[in-house]
């Protein structure tokens, strides 16, 4: 998909507006854009795929630079919470997008941080090593039992591994921890329909009716 310069300008404007509203510096955005600055000089077959589909112009870098010069939040540092969330998001992307060999190079088993175990759990699951995936995710749940996304991921491992009844408690708990999340409602409803039985199907219908109310 090709993105026009107009689309990229609109995206940049939306990005800095969102950052400003949350009192976050745009220095990270500028650093990201500069990583691709030299890509324009390369032949198309040597360019990063992102650069080929997302035009990078001097104007984009100048726009973000000007914003940084005028924003009162440009010297703000990322909070510990934001850094932790970023590390976890990066681990999730690596887990779902990279080969397991690359995952284990980036997050070796000696690394027992939450992002590392998260990435390995997803990587093992993609390799159909459900027992290793469950070992990693169960360890995370033992430490952070109130995290709905860990329970959701555990449910996904079991559901897609054909263990529908075993998956249900994990999805049910994820929904209880995050009751207004319509995506979780849909996932739970799908599982309940797959399992079958009047009670679960009726429950699934109720959940889907709530989804329609939230997102008509």
Feature locations, PLM:
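Glycine- and small hydrophobic-rich membrane-insertion segments that are intrinsically disordered
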Residues: 1-2, 198
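Extracytoplasmic and endomembrane cell-envelope/extracellular-matrix remodeling and assembly machinery
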Residues: 2-183, 191, 206-207
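Short coil/turn and helix-start
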Residues: 127, 197-199
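Short, structured loop/turn "capping" segments at alpha-beta junctions
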Residues: 184, 199-200
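Short, intrinsically disordered, charge-balanced linker/junction segments flanking boundaries
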Residues: 209-216
């Amino acid at each position: 998909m090709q993105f026009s310069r107009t689309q990229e300008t609109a995206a940049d404007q939306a990005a800095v507006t969102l950052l400003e509203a949350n009192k976050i510096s745009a220095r990270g955005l500028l650093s990201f854009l500069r990583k691709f600055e030299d890509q324009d000089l390369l032949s198309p077959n040597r360019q990063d795929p992102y650069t080929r589909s997302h035009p990078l112009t001097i104007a984009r870098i100048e726009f973000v630079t000007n914003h940084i010069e005028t924003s009162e939040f440009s010297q703000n540092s990322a909070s510990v919470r934001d850094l932790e969330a970023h590390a976890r998001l990066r681990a999730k992307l690596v887990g779902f997008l990279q080969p397991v060999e690359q995952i284990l190079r980036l997050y070796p088993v000696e690394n027992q941080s939450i992002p590392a175990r998260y990435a390995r759990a997803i990587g093992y699951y993609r390799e159909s090593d459900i027992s290793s995936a469950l070992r990693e995710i169960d360890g995370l749940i033992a430490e952070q039992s109130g995290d709905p996304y860990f329970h959701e991921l555990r449910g996904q491992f079991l559901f897609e591994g054909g263990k529908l009844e075993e998956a249900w408690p994990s999805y049910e708990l994820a929904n209880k921890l995050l009751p207004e999340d319509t995506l979780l409602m849909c996932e739970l409803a799908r599982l309940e329909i797959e399992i079958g039985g009047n009670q679960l199907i009726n429950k699934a219908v109720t959940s889907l009716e709530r989804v329609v109310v939230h997102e008509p």
